[in-house]
Design a protein with these regions (language model features):
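Small-residue-biased structural context
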Residues: 1-177
Length: 177
């Protein structure tokens, strides 16, 4: 059996040779449709995943207190709260500004840049959590591990869509006039 592996970053950026770009359809959308896609496909699902993961961790701690799991839950809660706040900022402030301002607006550009910086912080938090996935290697943790992996993968795709496609498309649109 031949197993072929791919770099998620290369795959998302269309750099894997012979592999179709999984974001090709997304790239074809207008930036406004991209914003709707981000909210509908990523924000909603990631909110749900954060809630499910938090509930599973809290339930497990009630059954069997473990300081390592408590520490992971605390860090996950901090990262989850930052993520949800970030989504609210995107949905309530930045995305509406991007809908309204079809010409250069320094405030909107500043907000987009701030979101990109927040993405770097969120990636650091997720990397820290990923580094502790060994805590969940036993079969007792299958569901939690699957949900965490889904969240990490979805966030990676989500951030790539925003930072590599949507935000640059928007900035290109408003600066070329």
């Amino acid at each position: 059996m031949i197993v072929q592996t791919f770099s998620l970053d290369n795959l998302l950026n269309g750099d894997e040779e012979g592999v179709p770009d999984p974001l090709a359809d997304y790239r074809k959308l207008s930036y406004r449709d991209q914003l709707e896609d981000l909210q509908r496909k990523h924000h909603d699902r990631e909110r749900e995943l954060v809630s499910q993961i938090t509930d599973l961790l809290e339930d497990s701690l009630h059954l069997k207190p473990d300081p390592r799991i408590r520490h992971f839950l605390d860090d996950f809660t901090d990262a989850g709260e930052a993520l949800l706040t970030h989504f609210d900022k995107e949905e309530q402030i930045v995305f509406p500004l991007m809908y309204i301002h079809l010409s250069y607006d320094s405030e909107t550009i500043k907000e987009v840049d701030a979101l990109t910086s927040e993405h770097r912080e969120q990636e650091k938090k997720m990397d820290s959590l990923k580094s502790r996935m060994h805590l969940f290697e036993t079969s007792d943790w299958n569901l939690l591990r699957e949900l965490l992996e889904e969240l990490f993968t979805d966030l990676s795709v989500h951030i790539s869509k925003e930072d590599d496609i949507t935000f640059p498309n928007y900035i290109d649109l408003v600066t070329r006039k």
